[in-house]
Every structure is written in C-alpha cells, then in structure tokens.
Amino acid sequence: MTSVVVVGTQWGDEGKGKITDFLSADAEVIARYQGGDNAGHTIVIDGKKFKLHLIPSGIFFPQKISVIGNGVVVNPKSLVKELAYLHDEGVTTDNLRISDRAHVILPYHIQLDQLQEDAKGDNKIGTTIKGIGPAYMDKAARVGIRIADLLDKDIFAERLRINLAEKNRLFEKMYDSTPLDFDAIFEEYYAYGQEIKQYVTDTSVILNDALDAGKRVLFEGAQGVMLDIDQGTYPFVTSSNPVAGGVTIGSGVGPSKINKVVGVCKAYTSRVGDGPFPTELFDEVGERIREVGHEYGTTTGRPRRVGWFDSVVMRHSRRVSGITNLSLNSIDVLSGLDTVKICVAYDLDGERIDHYPASLEQLKRCKPIYEELPGWQEDITGVRSLDELPENARNYVRRVGELVGVRISTFSVGPGREQTNILESVWASI
C-alpha cells in the first residue's frame, strides 16, 4: 500500500498540476478528490501546454488510471468539452474513471452563483461563477443530483423537475430573474450523461483495490489549503476541503491508507479573487513578479494578486494538512531581484504572532514581519541540482524549508517537467 497526496499550500495556482504530472510518472492510479471545473491546472509536455479543469493530470499517461472521485462536483458540459479537447490533441481518455457518487453541476447552479455574487455588492468573495458553491449547497441539503442519477432517465427527470421548480421560484421571487426551461436542460444534460457513461463506475472500489494490491496511488487536490472551507480564509474560500483530510471523504479511501502528503508552494505567494493577503505587493516588484510569473488565472484569466513568501501561511498549511514533504516552485521568477523577502511572523497591534488568525478583522490589522535575503541575478532555468543554484538562491530554498519546518523534496526552476529537480524521492521514502 503506497499513496501520496498532493495539496496546494497557499491560495491555489501553486503548480500542483505540474507536480502531480511529475509524480504521476511513478504512480499507477491518479485521483482527484474535490473541487470542480473552477480549478485550472496547466501541464507542459515537450514544450506544449495543456490546460485542464476537471480531468486529473494523470490522463497523459495512457497506461495509468485517472479517477474523478465522489468529492468532485462535475459539470457534464465542461467535462464533455474537455474530453473533446484532449481527443483533438491526440490524447486517449480510455483510462478515465468517474465516480457514480459525484454530484452534478447544472445550469441553475451557475445562474444562482452569479445572482448570489451580484447581490453581495462590495462584499463579493470572488467566485469563478462555475456553480461550485450552489452544487455543494444542494449536496449538503440532500437534494443534489449525482452522476448515477444523471444516467437514469426517469430518476434524472424526476429530480431535475423538483429541483428546477424550487430554483425557478427563487430566481423569480427573490432575484427577479428569468426562470430556466426544464426540457432544454433535461435533453442537453441527459445527452451529456450518455456521452460519459462509459467512464462511470464505483471509483472507491478501484482505489481501494489498487492500494490493497500494493499499487502506487496519487491523490490530486484542487485549489489550496488557504481556500479550504474549514481551514482557509473564510468566507473567501471554496466550498470543499482541499486539505489532505478531504481525500478520505472525496475518494472513499480511509485515512489509514494515506502515507505521504506533499505540499506544493511557489517561492512567492499569489491568489485570485478577494480576501486577506498580508504579504500582498502593490509596487513595481509585485508587477514584475506578476508579469515574469505569468500570474493570470487558468480558469478566469484574471490577474492574480502577488506577494512575498509567507511562512505563517505555510506553517498553518503544514499543521492542518499534515504535510510531510514540500515542493517549491517558480524560484526562477525571483531571479533578477536585488533583495528577496520572507514573512516570518505578523505584527498584530504591536504584538508578534506566529499563527494565522481566523478573524478577518485581525487579519486586516496584521503587518508582515520580513526577513530580507540577498537576491540573485543569474538565469537559473537550466539548473538541474541544488548545487547548481547560485549561493543566494540556494540559501533562499534552505531558509524556506527551515521556516516551514518541512523538508523540501523537489524544487522547480520553470514550467517544464525537466525543470523539476528531485532532492528526495517521495515514493522511495515510503
């Protein structure tokens, strides 16, 4: 039994797709356990970029099984579109498996997402308007429609009719919005269900059988710990649990079967949307990092907010997700800066604190306490070992590991597979 969980340790966009793709080379099964098509990851293979939102990164390995687990909320329209995109690129999807227990995102979820966000005015949380939150709301309220229901024509019609009647009343009476048509949704989405039917199964059986047989299973999280609905910057969070604990709920695999948790982070920090961000940069350094790092959302295209590396955030992520190994990405983006900074603690009303407050009001008053390190001017994109890094870059990497309290297993100096450098094999250490 060998399993590794990959989680984002910041606010998403840390390069999880790249690291998952890298670790997938030694895995036999790759599974997603939460989120939906609000999560975007970019994978570079032989210089070619692939952008995925729902399908696991392991799909590019045809001999390996890729799983969309029960904790994922699936937009069938987006899924069918993504499958077509992969087929057009010559990528087979015969190795894809989709949980019959996963919940379905329907047009009324997306419309409700938009209406709710608009109604918040200045208090918007920055949702991607993909219907993720409303779909998880229906799931928690026990009125959601699952993939298994979507495939059964009569059950789908019955449940869609009940749900749509309720949502349309909400649209008309509360939001003064246009109701949606039952027939149009039913025909379109039932057809999508038939298109994906071949991939649908009980994925918990596949995952547990693989683990019991001693196969290597890799679990891929979406978003990041700081967007976790329980452990993140609530309410500026997603509606699921990206933390490693979400694996057990979102995949049907027990906690005793998890061996390693790899936390993925960038050498700086970024986030899309609103919410607290203590180390955010508003100056020319921030603009430079954004442009050099191509910090624009994979899903939304929105410019990401950027800031210095925050070890307070990282220690929080380490605690709540049980991180055993760290993968540090995008070190190359910091090349050319005379000085690089790391937030080591916060100043809250004159008191130094080392933990991440739950209170948004306290977070607004938190000022980062920085440790400054000398930067490096060299181009490091061709570096293939820690020793090849300039001394100042090497010191930066080591200091990050010390402050977070987790050993660094890999570091990356660019988006390509070949630009990921191994310090310690995660699989070999299990």
From Swiss-Prot:
NCBIfam families: PRK01117.1, purA. Belongs to the adenylosuccinate synthetase family. Pathway: Purine metabolism; AMP biosynthesis via de novo pathway; AMP from IMP: step 1/2. PROSITE patterns: ADENYLOSUCCIN_SYN_1, ADENYLOSUCCIN_SYN_2. One of its GO terms (biological process) is IMP metabolic process. It catalyses: IMP + L-aspartate + GTP = N(6)-(1,2-dicarboxyethyl)-AMP + GDP + phosphate + 2 H(+). It comes from Streptococcus pyogenes serotype M49 (strain NZ131). Keywords: Cytoplasm, GTP-binding, Ligase, Magnesium, Metal-binding, Nucleotide-binding, Purine biosynthesis. It is found in: Cytoplasm. CDD domains: AdSS (cd03108). This is Adenylosuccinate synthetase. Its main location: cytoplasm. IMP binds at D13, E14, G15, K16, N38, A39, G40, H41, T128, R142, Q223, T238, R302.
